[in-house]
Amino acid sequence: MAEQSIQHHPLLRRRDGHHARVTFEELFFDLVYVFAVTQLSHELLTNLNPTGVIETLILWFAVWLGWQYTCWVTNWFDPETPRIRGLIFAVMLAGLVMASAIPGAFGDRGWIFVLAYVALQVGRTAYIAWELGPDHPLAANYRRMLGWVSISAVLWIAGAFVEHEARMALWAVAILCEYVSPMFGFPLPGLGRSKTSDWTIEGGHLAERCQLFVIVALGETLLATGATMARAEVWDVPVLSALLATFLGTLAMWWLYFGTSSKDATAAITRSDDPGRIGAYFHYIHAILIGGVIATAVGNDLVLAHPHDPLKTAYVVILVAGPAIYLLGSAIYKKAVYGVVPASHMVGVAALVLLVPVAYAVDLLTMGWLTTIVLLFVGFREGRTLRKRTLSSAAQPASH
């Protein structure tokens, strides 16, 4: 494989100038992450305290990194070739075991979670590095990546065999290794560092994969809403009102992402002079944005299950933090796409913060409606901005 171009490796996607489609193998792979997101939201719901939040945050980043690194593989490599398809299915199995172990990851199933995660990250990266051989243009990047996921693996494994607080600390450092190292090009002594300009990704495909994960997270939110509704003993007016509030809140999140920016995001990464840099940036942002969706799903569950209950501090935090994190992630995302932080999102975050003292005077149902109204307001403002942007773009050709 010496001196071959990226285009000539038999396992790589063919770059013919057309948008690389998302394959059925990739969609099948994503089903594991529907389950993983469900597990995370349930874990947070049953451990709604500071320790539980930190634990869920660590586990969420592990889930996200496993998906993200695999996403980059399927951007470069063709999932319809037998060897890459087999790799995806092996990663799916490891991901399924990892997701199944989430409830006991900080207990007696920590070693199962770790072995599945390490097998997923190190095994996939080592296999790709082996397939590429020593001379392929992507080989050096994968050797550096393998070095960093191996360093992280040592921390993951060490964490599985120590007590709870030490485990949290070691796993948090392991997460940082894998999350931050791409920002600096996976630098390692003797191996150098990668440049984002060397990451010759198919931008439209990567944007679409991120968008599909947002759909996964929003879909899990609806599944949780439906499941909680089904368990309700009485479908009275407050319960039906809670259902409407949570549904409209989820709809507002969908609109803020897909209705106002998703097509422009695809265009931004496709037209960029450095799509690798923008693609990496998109992945960093989506970890925050989707984390907000997961937290919001937990808040929705509380509103539906206990509409008349007063708010404990933990309830206030989750009901405000979920939408606020989502809006912050969405604002950073739109900054990457348009170059400007949308004022509507910052107003929305401020409004959510101002609801904190109000929350202690109302019940869960009222608070659920108040946070939904904030999301709907931001969505309405963004809709107006989109219309102005569309009219401005349509008028530009006529002005020349």
Regions flagged by a language model, labelled:
Residues 32-42, 363:
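Alpha-helical transmembrane segments of multi-pass membrane proteins
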